[in-house]
Amino acid sequence: MTDKSKESGSGKLLYCSFCGKSQHEVRKLIAGPSVYICDECVDLCNDIIREEIKDVLPKRESEALPTPREIRAHLDDYVIGQDHAKKVLAVAVYNHYKRLRNGDTTSDGVELGKSNILLIGPTGSGKTLLAETLARFLDVPFTMADATTLTEAGYVGEDVENIIQKLLQKCDYDVAKAERGIVYIDEIDKISRKAENPSITRDVSGEGVQQALLKLVEGTIASVPPQGGRKHPQQEFLQVDTSKILFICGGAFAGLDKVIEQRVATGTGIGFGAEVRSKDESKTVGELFTQVEPEDLVKYGLIPEFIGRLPVTASLTELDEEALIQILCQPKNALTKQYAALFELEGADLEFREDALKAIAKKAMERKTGARGLRSILEGVLLETMYELPSMDDVSKVVIDESVINGESEPLLIYTNSDSQAAGAE
């Protein structure tokens, strides 16, 4: 390499060691040990690396796609119950990614449409967890959006395009990667229109959002500003094809059960002609959700065009006490395993007796928050122990039973030293 630095007036004139341009011909010259590189060469190197990565991506695409049975088996490791919803999700996700791999048309020229998913189920039944677990298993970008924060374009709040913005952020603005992603829109029931008939006044956070979501969910070329900003209008917008993105919408749909019950009731008479049902005969919310029809969702407040964009509907049932006990200890990342791992870092074992698990599940049932309420119950029960344990010596085991859950006694501490144990018992 020839020495391209020479004296010029007050100092040396520096040259790029790669392309030979002087410091006056480029915007920036970065110095290393006896070498220099200009900003243009850095950009060129980045382009070369990007091309290399693109060559690697098709190899990944050629890997075998997990079958619906394999997807369902993975969901079983993390989500308890909801067998029908898992089966529906596994088939829908498999078909979606099979369509992406083989193109939108078959060899016969048949166009394959996109099937987005609507999850209906009570709070804490596992809607969000199912979507997260799916994305993690398939190793695709995943983002969550809250429908309650969305408004029509031009109003205070988030535009629907912000959803794609978040997805791009998750994959460092790699458009090709983002187009294979999954978007989960939570609280979709909260954007139902306020009345069954179209309103004269604008409903910017209800029907207006549904209208704005239509093209995005169905498939359109969304223009997203690079690196998130409208501060630089001269920047070129990124073009993202949303027809390749899988949209999963979820909501609790409180009150939908009454709409379904009204439709399925066989007795339409009034007075003596009306059908009388006992409390035992009345169906649970979960059972009613399995009978949901598009007309029920329209009556609830979703516009027909939006329901048409979500052809796959999966209903989740309420979790009973037995299912909550299983959630506490069976999944790979079960709560009892998580807290046991935390205690293990302090050098102590954590044991939950069978009656304690039942008491926790019973409390969660009373709160009507599903599996989401389990963590808050455990946090409250273990607070004092987690506060004191780091300052204590010789504690080898902490035992939790029903009386601890009910607030009648303190957790049992077992010490490695028998003298300390005797002192603790006193």
From Swiss-Prot:
Protein task? ATP-dependent specificity component of the Clp protease. It directs the protease to specific substrates. Can perform chaperone functions in the absence of ClpP.
Give the UniProt entry's GO cellular component terms: HslUV protease complex
Q: Which UniProt keywords apply?
A: ATP-binding, Chaperone, Metal-binding, Nucleotide-binding, Zinc
In terms of NCBIfam families, this protein maps to: clpX, PRK05342.1
Report the protein name in the record: ATP-dependent Clp protease ATP-binding subunit ClpX
Q: Which residues form the ClpX-type ZB domain?
A: 4-57
Organism this protein belongs to: Vibrio vulnificus (strain YJ016)
Q: Which PANTHER family match?
A: ATP-DEPENDENT CLP PROTEASE ATP-BINDING SUBUNIT CLPX-LIKE, MITOCHONDRIAL, ATP-DEPENDENT CLP PROTEASE ATP-BINDING SUBUNIT CLPX-LIKE, MITOCHONDRIAL-RELATED
Q: Which family does it belong to?
A: Belongs to the ClpX chaperone family.
GO MF annotation: an example: zinc ion binding
Q: Which residues bind Zn(2+)?
A: 16, 19, 38, 41
Q: Does the keyword Chaperone apply?
A: yes
Provide the GO biological process annotations. cell division; proteolysis involved in protein catabolic process
Q: Report the domain of life of the source organism.
A: Bacteria
Q: Which HAMAP family match?
A: ClpX
Which residues make up the binding site for ATP? 122-129
InterPro entries assigned to the protein according to its UniProt record, in alphabetical order: AAA+_ATPase (IPR003593), ATP-dep_Clp_protease_ClpX (IPR050052), ATPase_AAA_core (IPR003959), Clp_ATPase_C (IPR019489), Clp_protease_ATP-bd_su_ClpX (IPR004487), ClpX_bact (IPR046425), P-loop_NTPase (IPR027417), Znf_CppX_C4 (IPR010603)
Q: How does it assemble?
A: Component of the ClpX-ClpP complex. Forms a hexameric ring that, in the presence of ATP, binds to fourteen ClpP subunits assembled into a disk-like structure with a central cavity, resembling the structure of eukaryotic proteasomes.
Q: Cross-referenced SUPFAM superfamilies, in alphabetical order?
A: Glucocorticoid receptor-like (DNA-binding domain) (SSF57716), P-loop containing nucleoside triphosphate hydrolases (SSF52540)
